[in-house]
Amino acid sequence: MSDLNTLTLAQARDALRKGETTSVALTEACLAAIEGAGALNAFVHKTPELALERAKAADERLQGREEAPKMCGLPIGIKDLFCTKGVPSQAASRILEGFKPEYESTVSQQLADAGAVMLGKLNMDEFAMGSSNETSCYGNAVNPWRRGNDDAALTPGGSSGGSAAAVAADLCLAATGTDTGGSIRQPAAFVGITGIKPTYGRCSRWGIVAFASSLDQAGPMTKDVRDAAIMLEAMCGHDPKDSTSAELAVPDFEAMLTGDIRGKVIGIPREYRMDGMPEEIEALWQQGTEMLRAAGAEIRDISLPHTKYALPTYYVIAPAEASSNLARYDGVRYGHRAKLAQGDGITEMYEKTRAEGFGHEVQRRVMVGTYVLSAGFYDAYYNRARKVRSLIKKDFEDVFAAGVDAILTPATPSAAFGLGEMTDADPVQMYLNDVFTVTVNLAGLPGVSVPAGLDKQGLPLGLQLIGRPWEEGDLLNTAYALEQAAGFVAKPSKWW
């Protein structure tokens, strides 16, 4: 078989079962692709020896008598936000320089237990704060796609930009991501792959470096919807180490992919029609609506009245939680510690370490969070944002109670933009990238981004489906129907 790294998880799994290839061969193909893709800066820590060791173990397991798990022998990348035992886990921040955890995150452990092969750690925005992968201490990851005849480097999105770039460029068969306000779905849309953020509590957060604890959720980033179903099943499950982890059975998501959505009710929220939205995004949304109607779904106009408050609500709650979570990084026990001048005490050590260790965007969000939690502003900002969050959640509950099965929206307000294009812009311009995705996190719902077309410059555009809580199987089936109808098969032309 040629170009093993271009296979989907499902194709590779079937090839392994039939004896047409081996996990070692798959892993070597991916490692070779990674070595040749330095220009993308997707992988920031490579683990070739560990990968080949796991691949050999997977091959032995596949030849054993017992049925091996679906993910057995499949090479994947792990976002740098996941703690991986003995492997650098920095959350793309200088403050965690040299940190090698003594433990493994629950999600990466479950994938390892299922036989998945970790190729290394993937680039991301620092502490998952960003929408362009430009806040990383490793430098930005680069989108494998290019505009028409233009050689300008584009963002792969963020914060899971390295994961997105690696999957789109066939450096790995799939990757883990995390999503706090759109960090799986926005990059997936920017590079033409599938990304699902499951219901809050479906995947354990234990061992994932925290950004905003009430919003963070891990999920898979894959080449298609079937792969997302396969990988999500391996990532899910109750974890007693995470108090927010749901004690629910994990269904066989792949078995639910029938593509039959006849009789399903799809909601189209009028509040997502924004001023200044590019015509191409509007047209794609309309096409997606017609595709689902043609597949037998009933299309219903719906209202989510508090949508306009979602972005400001998110950018109060997320920084507030981040300022609390990031207080633990002080240079005392691990990570970066600033060099001190004579006479400097503990306070100076904290101040200098944090000033050197945190990048500008992280510092901005910590300051915003500290401000909204301060005595004079707690009620005016933080408490008010929490109340609005509950109203946003109720909007969705009302719509689902009225019989809607899933909601179709654009995934992003534009295609991928150029690296550096927003450097001098108002930070709010960057935050607007999350305008269609943050509501899903605030309400704790599952959301999936599916590639559905190209813009006039040849860049991928995605559509988002939002589902009922805990019904990822149903949501993925609707996404599968959309994927089949859209027929998106475009790949980036190799320039790296």
Curated annotation (Swiss-Prot):
It comes from the Bacteria. GO terms for biological process: translation. GO terms for cellular component: glutamyl-tRNA(Gln) amidotransferase complex. Its EC number is 6.3.5.7. SUPFAM superfamilies: Amidase signature (AS) enzymes (SSF75304). InterPro entries: Amidase, Amidase_CS, Amidase_dom, AS_sf, GatA. Keywords: ATP-binding, Ligase, Nucleotide-binding, Protein biosynthesis. The keyword Secreted does not apply. It catalyses: L-glutamyl-tRNA(Gln) + L-glutamine + ATP + H2O = L-glutaminyl-tRNA(Gln) + L-glutamate + ADP + phosphate + H(+). Gene3D superfamilies: Amidase signature (AS) domain (3.90.1300.10). GO terms for molecular function: ATP binding; glutaminyl-tRNA synthase (glutamine-hydrolyzing) activity. The active site is at K79, S159, S183. Belongs to the amidase family. GatA subfamily. Heterotrimer of A, B and C subunits. Allows the formation of correctly charged Gln-tRNA(Gln) through the transamidation of misacylated Glu-tRNA(Gln) in organisms which lack glutaminyl-tRNA synthetase. The reaction takes place in the presence of glutamine and ATP through an activated gamma-phospho-Glu-tRNA(Gln). This is Glutamyl-tRNA(Gln) amidotransferase subunit A. It comes from Ruegeria pomeroyi (strain ATCC 700808 / DSM 15171 / DSS-3).
